[in-house]
């Protein structure tokens, strides 16, 4: 049976939550039952008996694995998939992306964010970090679809309308205390001046908000920052107080050894965005140097205008292959490490004690159909998930103890796609 979002609220997450019992799933090669109560895994053992009112899922023949966390993206850019491909980053931004975005309304952001969430859920993602416009509309989409999100208050020094909306979000911060939260998202050092960055530091500390920013994505960004401030972007952000525990630094491509040390010492997270970096020819994430210094790493897709899809399967594969090819080392970036970036390390970077299917952890998980041809044979499920899997293998998605996809069906998906097409027709005439 497929439940609506309002039904989920009645079934899961309330005081008398009857919970979910997953029967017959394979975990670490063993057939087990998994009980979920009030958003957490509460019991894992063979042959558990259903409790009164419990929602029972038949998972025979399926594997249960942790769900994915997408630590960098611009969700409503799903409306620009294929709109502007095969061009240099700053031409892409100045001549295509920013003019398109200038026409977007809150309803477009809502429609585009729902389309993005639909794609993410159908490929196993239960949390996304967003950095885009109209935060209330993006948050509304995430709340309605039952997915975790941290909605970034996108900040630029020269955009008074966006900054006014951000102030309104801060005034209503109590609306963002559940699984949909807000973060501060200054765009980059080339769009946010010193005064605004210092305000971001002060305000984020006052409200206890995470920071999410692009960092050292291109050689031009680094050269311009050195020319203006005498420091690399990383060093400049460190000087201003942006680098701190769990600040999300998206891209981190052009880093000196000193930059990497600063990131490691601060506890910030380097968010690896391999497919976008490759497509925009921005450069290669310095995987070996970052890992050698113990920097925390998570993975992200970026937006659909630069990476075109939102599947973490592709991101995992891209991260592994890129590191191996660039370093000419088949042993670097093993499947288990890459999988951890997308699950456990991603969860921690998102502020969620999840990423494992273990008692006491947040109940964010996937039921994987291991009969899909790309997963046969199954010598190593983790290797298959990183190197050969596709979104079609994800049968069921559970986020915060709620079923948000079952049998590859998501509530209202036809209407979500239709509304996104309406926005595209108005914005691009296509």
Feature locations, PLM:
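Active-site microenvironment of metallo-dependent hydrolases
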Residues: 2-32, 36-38, 42, 47, ...
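Divalent metal-coordination and catalytic microenvironments
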Residues: 25, 39, 61, 72, ...
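Active-site gating loops and adjacent loop-to-helix segments of metal-dependent hydrolytic enzymes
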Residues: 79-111, 118, 145-156, 219-244, ...
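Alpha-helical scaffold segments that flank or form the walls of functional sites
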Residues: 81-147, 167-176, 421-429
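Metal-coordinating catalytic core of metallo-dependent amide/deamination hydrolases
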Residues: 138-253
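Histidine/acidic-residue-rich catalytic or RNA/ligand-binding cores of hydrolases
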Residues: 219-231, 259-264, 281-290, 307-324, ...
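His/Asp/Glu-enriched, well-ordered alpha-helical/loop segment
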Residues: 239-246, 288-372, 386-391
């Amino acid at each position: 049976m497929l439940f609506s979002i309002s039904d989920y609220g009645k079934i899961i997450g309330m005081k008398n939550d009857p919970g979910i019992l997953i029967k017959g799933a394979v975990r670490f090669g063993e057939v087990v039952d998994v009980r979920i109560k009030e958003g957490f895994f509460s019991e894992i053992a063979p042959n558990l008996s259903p409790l009164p009112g419990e929602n029972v899922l038949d998972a025979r023949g399926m594997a249960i694995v942790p769900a994915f966390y997408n630590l960098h993206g611009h969700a409503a850019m799903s409306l620009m998939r294929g709109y502007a491909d095969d061009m240099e980053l700053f031409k892409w931004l100045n001549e295509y992306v920013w003019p398109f975005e200038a026409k977007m309304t809150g309803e477009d952001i809502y429609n585009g964010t729902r389309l993005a969430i639909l794609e993410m859920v159908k490929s196993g993602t239960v949390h996304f970090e967003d950095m885009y416009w109209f935060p209330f509309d993006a948050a509304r989409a995430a709340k309605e679809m039952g997915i975790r999100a941290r909605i970034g208050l996108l900040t630029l020094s020269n955009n008074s309308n966006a900054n006014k909306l951000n102030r309104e979000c801060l005034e209503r911060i109590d609306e963002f205390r559940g699984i949909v939260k807000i973060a501060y998202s200054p765009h980059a050092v080339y769009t946010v001046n010193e005064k605004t960055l210092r305000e971001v530091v002060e305000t984020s500390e006052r409200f206890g908000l995470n920071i999410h920013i692009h960092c050292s994505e291109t050689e031009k960004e680094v050269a311009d920052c050195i020319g203006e401030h005498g420091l690399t972007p990383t060093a400049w952000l460190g000087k201003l107080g942006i680098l701190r525990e769990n600040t999300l630094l998206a891209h981190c491509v052009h880093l000196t050894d000193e930059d990497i040390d600063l990131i490691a010492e601060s506890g910030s997270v380097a968010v690896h965005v391999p497919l976008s970096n490759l497509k925009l020819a921005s450069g290669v994430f310095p995987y070996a140097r970052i890992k050698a210094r113990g920097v925390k790493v998570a993975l992200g897709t970026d937006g659909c205008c630069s990476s075109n899809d939102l599947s973490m399967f592709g991101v995992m594969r891209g991260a592994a292959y890129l590191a191996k090819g660039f370093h000419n080392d088949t042993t670097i970036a093993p499947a288990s490490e890459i999988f951890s970036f997308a699950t456990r390390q991603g969860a921690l970077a998102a502020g969620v004690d999840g990423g494992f299917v273990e008692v006491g952890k947040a109940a964010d998980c996937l039921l994987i159909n291991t009969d899909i041809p790309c997963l046969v044979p199954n010598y190593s499920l983790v290797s298959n998930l990183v190197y050969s899997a596709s979104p079609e293998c994800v049968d069921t998605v559970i986020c915060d103890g709620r079923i948000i996809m079952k049998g590859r069906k998501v509530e209202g998906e036809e209407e979500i796609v239709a509304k996104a097409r309406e926005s595209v027709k108005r914005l691009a005439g296509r």
